[in-house]
Amino acid sequence: MKQGIHPEYHKVIFLDTTTNFKFLSGSTKTSSETMEWEDGNEYPVIRLDVSSDSHPFYTGRQKFAAADGRVERFNKKFGLKSNNN
C-alpha cells in the first residue's frame, strides 16, 4: 500500500441518539467528542439518527402496504369475485 494516502482506521463508539444504543466498531470517521467504553478506554463518539436498534426493518415494527395487482383492483372496483381457488 502507498504510504500517506489512506485515512487512519481506529475504533469509535456509534451512539444511536433515538434509543441511546451504543456499539463499538472500527471506522475512519472521527469526532472531538469522546466517551468511556466498557473496557475502560476512551473512544471518539459518532452520533447516529438511525441504527439497527431503532430502524423499523430490524425491529419488526415495519408496516407493509398491501400491493394489489391491476386485476384485483378491477374486480374490487366492479364488485367481482376473483377466481383464486
UniProtKB/Swiss-Prot annotation:
Please provide one cellular component term from the Gene Ontology annotations of this protein.
ribonucleoprotein complex
Cross-referenced Gene3D superfamilies: Ribosomal protein L31
Q: What domain of life does the native source organism fall in? A: Bacteria
Q: Name one GO biological process term.
A: translation
**Residues in coiled coil:** none
Asked whether the keyword Ribosomal protein is assigned, the reply is: yes
Which InterPro entries does the UniProt record give? Ribosomal_bL28/bL31-like_sf (IPR034704), Ribosomal_bL31 (IPR002150), Ribosomal_bL31_B (IPR027493), Ribosomal_bL31_sf (IPR042105)
A GO MF annotation of the entry reads: structural constituent of ribosome
One of the Pfam families matching this protein, by short name: Ribosomal_L31
- Keywords of the record: Ribonucleoprotein, Ribosomal protein
How this chain assembles, per its entry, is: Part of the 50S ribosomal subunit.
What PANTHER family does its record include? Answer: 50S RIBOSOMAL PROTEIN L31, CHLOROPLASTIC (PTHR33280), LARGE RIBOSOMAL SUBUNIT PROTEIN BL31C (PTHR33280:SF1)
> What family does this chain come from, according to its entry?
Belongs to the bacterial ribosomal protein bL31 family. Type B subfamily.
**Protein's UniProt name:** Large ribosomal subunit protein bL31B
Natural source organism: Staphylococcus epidermidis (strain ATCC 35984 / DSM 28319 / BCRC 17069 / CCUG 31568 / BM 3577 / RP62A)
Lineage start: Bacteria, Bacillati, Bacillota, Bacilli, Bacillales
